[in-house]
Regions:
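Glycine-rich phosphate/pyrophosphate-binding loop at beta-loop-alpha junctions
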Residues: 4-105, 161-199
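Active-site-adjacent helical/loop segments in soluble small-molecule enzymes
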Residues: 1, 5, 12, 18-21, ...
Length: 199
C-alpha cells in the first residue's frame, strides 16, 4: 500500500480535442484516458499520489489556464506563445475548462519541456528499451528526472515528502503512443534525437 513513505508520481501530457461541424461545437475531453488515471489514483491513494501535467514550452495551455484560473477563457497565443510544437499529437493552445476545473484540486503541478528534450528522450528510450514513442508521448518521461533534488520539482518533493521517501517512489508515465507513426518518420525522429543528444 502506498503512503507518504512510498509515494506515487504520475506525469502525463495534456490533451484536448475539439471539432466544429456546421456551427455545432463538439468537444471531446480526455477524461477517459490519462485524466481518469490521475483522478483514480488520487482517490485511491490520496496524498501519496502526486500528479503533474507535462506540456511543451510552446503550448502550455493547461498550465496557463490553471495558473490564471481562466481555464478555457485564455489560450497560449494570448501570452505571445506560438503553439508550434513537435508534440502536436496532443498539444493544443486552449485548455478545457471542464478538465481544468475538475482536475485542479487533484494536481500537484504542471511543468513544460522543450521539443528538443522530447526528441532526445525519444532516442534514449529507443536505445534503452527498444520502445519507439511519438514526441508528444515523451513529455511525461521527464517527470521522474525533475522530481530529484536540485531539479525543478525537487523543492516540491522536499516539502511534501518525508526524508528518504523519494528513493521509494513509484513513477508512472502516461506514454500516449507511437506505433501508428510511419517507420520512415519515426527514423527521422530518432535521428534528430540522437543528433541533439550529441550537442
Amino acid at each position: 500500500m502506498k503512503n507518504s513513505r512510498t509515494p506515487i508520481f504520475v506525469t502525463q501530457p495534456y490533451m484536448y480535442i475539439a471539432n466544429n461541424y456546421d456551427n455545432f461545437d463538439c468537444m471531446v475531453r480526455a477524461m477517459a484516458s490519462g485524466y481518469s488515471h490521475s483522478f483514480g489514483l488520487k482517490l485511491l491513494f490520496g496524498d501519496a499520489a502526486h500528479c503533474f501535467f507535462a506540456e511543451p514550452t510552446h503550448s502550455p495551455c493547461m498550465m496557463l489556464g490553471m495558473a490564471t484560473g481562466e481555464n478555457s477563457s485564455v489560450c497560449v497565443q494570448d501570452f505571445g506563445i506560438d503553439n508550434c510544437t513537435a508534440a502536436d499529437g496532443l498539444a493544443v493552445g486552449r485548455a478545457s475548462g471542464f478538465v481544468g476545473g475538475l482536475m485542479r484540486p487533484f494536481m500537484s503541478g504542471c511543468y513544460t519541456l522543450q521539443d528538443e528534450r522530447m526528441y532526445t528522450l525519444l532516442a534514449q528510450l529507443a536505445d534503452a528499451e527498444a520502445l519507439y514513442l511519438e514526441p508528444s508521448a515523451l513529455a511525461g518521461m521527464y517527470g521522474p528526472v525533475l522530481t530529484q533534488p536540485g531539479q525543478l520539482l525537487g523543492a516540491y518533493t522536499k516539502t511534501v515528502l518525508p526524508a528518504g521517501a523519494l528513493a521509494n517512489a513509484t513513477h508512472l508515465v502516461w506514454a500516449t503512443g507511437g506505433n501508428m507513426v510511419p517507420r520512415e518518420e519515426m527514423q527521422r525522429y530518432y535521428a534528430k534525437g540522437k543528433a541533439l543528444a550529441q550537442q
